[in-house]
């Protein structure tokens, strides 16, 4: 049943960080959550060509800080920082509080599940054969140091009348191992035959010891019971 659970969700707090790190009271929680959703929706639509990996949102003291992880930071920043300033103003208007935008570059996009899935989707939309696109993505990931990768596509593959799923795997992808650093993402390709879904799993190795925050909290174990004399 390991394939039934979301690989990122089950590892939150163990080896995976959250994409939103803030605390709110009961009356503010819904507004903050709705604001996060609208900010992500806006940035995703605005930065379609920027190879967007993920968006991390923090809310320190009546403000919002957005970190954009992208493989093409120059596209996000724009000429002399004009584009990022427009994004900052738009995010501040959506969230209703002062905004700060940071850009983080993804050094190896071939090892990022979201970017790999988006790359396969763009190839399928350009009518590249799905098997060739999958194999190329798998080979690039393994060449750059991935321990394992699995790619699955589903839909009307090659324009077939009946939809089906096909997957390709190389190396190890241990979904049951919680300390395994597995990056998972979904993407979709809009072709003339319909929508093709793409799932990507990338195994980058095991993280021993867990996250630093998890290590800081020591488990409170029960004190060992004293044995009575004459008993073993």
Swiss-Prot record:
InterPro entries: KH_dom, KH_dom-like_a/b, KH_dom_type_2, KH_sf_prok-type, Ribosomal_S3_C_sf, Ribosomal_uS3_bac-typ, Ribosomal_uS3_C, Ribosomal_uS3_CS. Coiled coil: none annotated. Residues 213-232 are annotated as: Disordered. One of its GO terms (molecular function) is structural constituent of ribosome. Keywords: Ribonucleoprotein, Ribosomal protein, RNA-binding, rRNA-binding. It comes from the Bacteria. One of its GO terms (cellular component) is cytosolic small ribosomal subunit. One of its GO terms (biological process) is translation. The keyword Glycosyltransferase does not apply. Residues 39-107 form the KH type-2 domain. Binds the lower part of the 30S subunit head. Binds mRNA in the 70S ribosome, positioning it for translation. Part of the 30S ribosomal subunit. Forms a tight complex with proteins S10 and S14. Belongs to the universal ribosomal protein uS3 family. This is Small ribosomal subunit protein uS3. The gene is rpsC.
């Amino acid at each position: 049943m390991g394939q039934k659970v979301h690989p990122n969700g089950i590892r939150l707090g163990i080896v995976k960080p959250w994409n939103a790190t803030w605390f709110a009271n009961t009356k503010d929680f819904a507004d903050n959550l709705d604001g996060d959703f609208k900010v992500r929706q806006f940035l995703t639509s605005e930065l379609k060509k920027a190879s967007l990996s993920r968006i991390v949102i923090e809310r320190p003291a009546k403000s919002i800080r957005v970190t954009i992880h992208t493989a093409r930071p120059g596209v996000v920043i724009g000429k002399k920082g004009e584009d990022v300033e427009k994004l900052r103003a738009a995010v501040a208007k959506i969230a209703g509080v002062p905004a700060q935008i940071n850009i983080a570059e993804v050094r190896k996009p071939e090892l990022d599940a979201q970017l790999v899935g988006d790359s396969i989707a763009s190839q399928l939309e350009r009518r590249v054969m799905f098997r060739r696109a999958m194999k190329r993505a798998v080979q690039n990931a393994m060449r750059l140091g991935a321990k394992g990768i699995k790619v699955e596509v589903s839909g009307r593959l090659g324009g077939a009348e009946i939809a089906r799923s096909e997957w390709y795997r190389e190396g190890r992808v241990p979904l049951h191992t919680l300390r395994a650093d597995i990056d998972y993402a979904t993407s979709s390709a809009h072709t003339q035959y319909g929508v093709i879904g793409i799932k990507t799993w990338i195994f980058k190795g095991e993280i021993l010891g867990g996250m630093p925050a998890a290590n800081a909290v020591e488990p409170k174990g029960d004190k060992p019971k004293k044995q009575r004399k004459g008993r073993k």
